[in-house]
């Protein structure tokens, strides 16, 4: 099954573009968060996905994305997990950690959303 494509959250604040998905259960791609403590960010991602019973939907998938600029002034890490409930639709829940240099860590929920293929 090929899960490559661009998936946009129902609130349009998160975009996952999956490329190079393969039968070994991994994929590459990009992830955009329209809001972070540092404004909109684009992350490179490597994710994983797993079939249950057979090679069709539903399937489990997840990814972690982080950004840490040169000089390491902060790190933002988002993690998402969920299912491809049917072809073209992801049901995902996400969390974030944000750690600024010399600051206090902030942990937050990103929410639970349907993501639709565009």
Model regions and ranges:
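Central antiparallel beta-sheet cores of small beta-barrel/beta-sandwich binding domains
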Residues: 1-81, 93, 97-118
């Amino acid at each position: 099954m090929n899960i490559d494509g661009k998936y946009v959250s129902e609130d349009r604040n998160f975009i996952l573009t999956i490329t190079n998905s393969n039968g070994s259960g991994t994929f590459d791609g990009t992830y955009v968060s329209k809001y972070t403590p540092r404004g909109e960010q684009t992350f490179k991602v490597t994710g994983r996905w797993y079939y249950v019973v057979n090679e069709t939907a539903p399937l489990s998938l997840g990814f972690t994305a982080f950004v840490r600029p040169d000089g390491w002034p902060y790190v933002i890490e988002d993690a998402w997990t969920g299912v491809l409930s049917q072809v073209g639709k992801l049901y995902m829940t996400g969390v974030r950690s944000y750690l600024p240099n010399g600051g206090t860590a902030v942990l937050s929920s990103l929410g639970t959303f349907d993501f639709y293929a565009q």
